[in-house]
Amino acid sequence: MGALRVLRYVSMIWRPELGSCARQRDAGFGTEARRPSQPHRSSKHKDLVEDQPFPGLLRTENLGLEELAHVLRAAVVDQKGPLVTLNKPQGLPVTGRPGELTLLSVLPQLSQALGLEHQELQVVRAPGKEASGLVLLSSCPQTASRLQKFFIHSRRAQRPTATYCAVTDGIPEPSEGTVCMPLKMEQMNDVDLAVPVMSPSRKDIQEGVKRTLSRFHVMATGRGCALVQLQPLTVFPNQLQVHMALQLCPILGDHTYAARVGTVLGQRFLWPAETTKPQRQVLDEALLRHLRLSPSQVAQMPLHLHLHRLLLPGTGSRDPPSELLAPLPPYFSRTLQCLRLSQQ
């Protein structure tokens, strides 16, 4: 796949307005899902669109370094001075094993594509592999250090700097609140999982149990699902997925922690986290009809968790924070339209 082909691919797939359900604005995220026109395409371009495992999902694992660099170059939402902000596709890890395609592995090619050949980019802030959204890069170590100090100080003061949006299977009750739960990492079948610790001892804390805290606010509801705003106040792997599962409302596309939520006679409950293995998320038939998905597509459903907003320090010590926004990915906008999730 050449560079021209990748750029055309990006224009077809990585657009915030791409969708396939009713034309209607989503819940306040500044994107719109439209039924795309069907221009004549070559068979290769047609295959790129039609063989996607989930509608509107960009599969970065099928790209090479140069191709991914072009995709990320097209995903840049802001570039000022040493700072580069881009909208990361879902499924792209920040780090990984040697030879694995990651955000770090593509930074040299991305720097060249941005005209920064002699300036080394480093990651300042980024969502995890399964989430999409804002990635903050810097070519200046001093700027990166200043930003890291700002984020650390904000966490200590419990001032959220990151705002995610998520679609949940189920509607959290109450509609807003705070989830506070100690978590630890535990390996199960060679998979590292975040596990709640109800009453951690001093020994637990010494062995790595961390207090985690997140705020949530339901922005819209529809078809038994919710569009939820999430603001983590601590940093822990998979914190938001675990917190939503604890609310009995797992995030759509969470094929790791959704299995902890069981249902008996229409009532939801939590399975023991220590003995519940990750498995593909199971959705009821009515929800599948609303989403217009085939069984094979459901198995490939991406995590509907998007880092939508970041606050950065102002230029002066007394200046208010500045704001960065990233539009929703196409599959996320499509889901909002199919579930009729509009701002209430």
From Swiss-Prot:
Any one of the GO BP annotations: positive regulation of mitochondrial translation
Compartmental location: Mitochondrion matrix
GO CC annotation: mitochondrial matrix; ribonucleoprotein granule
Enzyme kind, highest EC tier: isomerase
UniProt xrefs under SUPFAM superfamilies: Pseudouridine synthase (SSF55120)
Reaction(s) this enzyme catalyzes, per UniProt: a uridine in mRNA = a pseudouridine in mRNA
UniProt superkingdom: Eukaryota
Main location, first listed in the record: mitochondrion
Keyword hit for Cell membrane: no
Keyword Transmembrane helix: no
Region described as Disordered: spans on this chain: 25-53
Alphabetical UniProt keywords: Isomerase, Mitochondrion, mRNA processing, Transit peptide
A GO MF label: RNA binding
Segment annotated as transit peptide: 1-36
Transmembrane portions of the chain: none
EC annotation from Swiss-Prot or TrEMBL: 5.4.99.-
Similarity remark: Belongs to the pseudouridine synthase RluA family.
Protein function: Catalyzes uridine to pseudouridine isomerization (pseudouridylation) of specific mitochondrial mRNAs (mt-mRNAs), a post-transcriptional modification necessary for their translation. Acts at position 390 in COXI mt-mRNA and at position 697-699 in mitochondrial COXIII mt-mRNA. As a component of a functional protein-RNA module, consisting of RCC1L, NGRN, RPUSD3, RPUSD4, TRUB2, FASTKD2 and 16S mitochondrial ribosomal RNA (16S mt-rRNA), controls 16S mt-rRNA abundance and may play a role in mitochondrial ribosome biogenesis.
Complex and partners: Forms a regulatory protein-RNA complex, consisting of RCC1L, NGRN, RPUSD3, RPUSD4, TRUB2, FASTKD2 and 16S mt-rRNA.
Protein name: Mitochondrial mRNA pseudouridine synthase Rpusd3
